[in-house]
Amino acid sequence: MDRRTLLISLASPAVLPSHSAVAGSAAELRQISYPVFGGQEDSFRHYCIEVLKLAVEHCGVGYQLKPVLQPVGQGRAIRQLSAGEGPLNILWSMTSAERERDLLPLRFPLDRGLMGWRLLLVRKAEQQRFAQIRSLEALRALTAVQMHDWPDTQILRANGLQVGTGSSYENLFAMLQHGRTDYFPRSVLEIAEDMARYGASHDLAIAPGLLLSYPTAFYFFVSPREPALAKDLSLGLERILSNGSWRALFLQQMRRQSKALKLHERQVLALRNPLLPAATPLQRTELWEEPGRLGA
């Protein structure tokens, strides 16, 4: 994935007209302030920004996009958004019942479900060890690593897997490198860039043959104090679903990478997700992707 093709400059706000003509100056436009999380600037993040941009262009209302330039951890950003404090009024994250209770979810899975398809980063010297693993029972003898405030931590533990946690994204790779944990589950949307950034320096590899899978969704979440913003963006998202521009953008991100990861050749270990809200629109098949189709 080429992040340069999707990058929106973080140096200044982007003023986006709606799909219909918007009168007035930028000063009259409503503002959408989104976070820049430290240490995780990747092309999936920029893809999410591009989806947000498309939704604004098609919602029929004028908005100004403004990045919050200081690093803000995910847990802190969610607390600020829920309380109506701080500069944010939107963020994107994996869903959970707790997050849908505290925030306004836009139930439009930005990841098309693929955030729950996880490959394993391991130490390069231990690839053969993981090549012998064919069951969850065998995997339970080892320890995964995740951020302390990621929903994935609870999901993995609910399936009987051991999880060590860290409070710094970069430190997770160091924990794996130095043997404090055994593997780092990363989504198929993230793992190629993780390898490009940390693989050589931390002596890591992608474990052969395995793929963990659990149902989940990665949404935009809006401040509960801004229901009008949630309504406007939901309309824009439905329009880019209908006109095909959203899936085209998604495939631009994923198709080449999916083929390289050989997803269709991997053994799938299915996990349950006790955090998945009942309102998740699993019945809307047009919102979801099957990884095996991406390399076609």
List each language-model region with its residue ranges.
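Acidic, polar ligand-binding/catalytic clefts
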Residues: 70-138
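N-terminal export signals
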Residues: 5-23
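Bilobed "Venus flytrap"/periplasmic-binding protein-like clamshell domains
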Residues: 41-55, 120-160, 172, 189
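Extended ligand-binding regions for polar small-molecule ligands
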Residues: 53-58, 124-127, 215-257
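An extracytoplasmic/periplasmic, membrane-proximal ligand-sensing/linker region
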Residues: 236-296
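A ligand-binding cleft/hinge motif common to bilobed small-molecule-binding domains
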Residues: 82, 90-102, 183-203
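Periplasmic-binding protein-like
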Residues: 36, 114-119, 196-234, 256-278
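Extracytoplasmic small-molecule ligand-binding "clamshell" domains
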Residues: 25-100, 233
